[in-house]
């Protein structure tokens, strides 16, 4: 008999940003005269820039011609795109990596969940607090987060980011297998220095841990 993954039933509710959207819409209905400044999900607010529009038109024209039409792309992404990423995002910062280390995906949210497929379910995890909810939810859905009680998961190590510590988390006081870091941080906006990040790398090396680093907002710095 096919059985449902019981860990889905442990999730406390729907996706956080969906709940926020419902509350915002309800407020707009009851307060139509008020202007709402959304600080929820980071949706776009401006139209596409000319360079992006030009590239999309060019790609569409290529797909419309038998001579230049192409089907599925390579499983890791097109070489020209991976090489451009290395050139502009890594070599420009003095970082040398091999093209085999670059994968083209469909966003951080998808791969945050996809990483779970290659890591054991009983690895321990550490997250900054507050944190982007997908990091925890994706682990909860495979049973790695434990039991949800009083707003906390029993098997998750929470690393407080408060005004008292300038929103900079301390290293865990015990071994953690998987560490989620996002800097510039969502939602605090904090940026860690190279020296502060080095502490995390050293911790990971000393404890045979993995750092899952989300650099979604690196362009801000």
Per-segment meaning from a language model:
Residues 2-106:
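N-terminal small-domain helix-loop-helix segment of the aminotransferase-like
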Residues 67-208, 212, 218-220:
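Conserved core of the PLP fold type I
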């Amino acid at each position: 008999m096919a059985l449902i993954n019981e860990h889905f039933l442990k999730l406390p509710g729907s996706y956080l940003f969906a709940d926020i959207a419902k509350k915002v819409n309800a407020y707009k209905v009851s307060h139509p005269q008020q202007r709402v400044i959304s600080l929820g999900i980071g949706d776009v607010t401006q139209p596409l820039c000319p360079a992006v529009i030009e590239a999309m038109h060019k790609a569409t024209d290529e797909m419309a011609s038998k001579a230049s039409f192409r089907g599925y792309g390579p499983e890791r992404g097109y070489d020209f795109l991976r090489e451009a990423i290395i050139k502009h995002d890594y070599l420009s910062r003095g970082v040398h990596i091999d093209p085999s280390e670059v994968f083209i995906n469909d966003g951080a949210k998808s791969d945050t969940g996809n990483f779970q497929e290659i890591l054991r379910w009983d690895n321990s995890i550490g997250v900054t607090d507050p944190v982007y909810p997908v990091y925890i939810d994706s682990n909860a859905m495979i049973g790695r987060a434990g039991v949800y009680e009083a707003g906390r998961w029993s098997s998750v190590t929470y690393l407080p980011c408060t005004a008292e510590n300038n929103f900079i988390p301390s290293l865990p006081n015990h071994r953690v297998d998987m560490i989620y870091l996002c800097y510039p941080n969502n939602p605090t906006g904090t940026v860690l220095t190279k020296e502060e990040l080095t502490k995390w790398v050293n911790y990971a090396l000393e404890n045979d841990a993995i750092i899952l680093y989300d650099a979604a907002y690196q362009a801000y710095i």
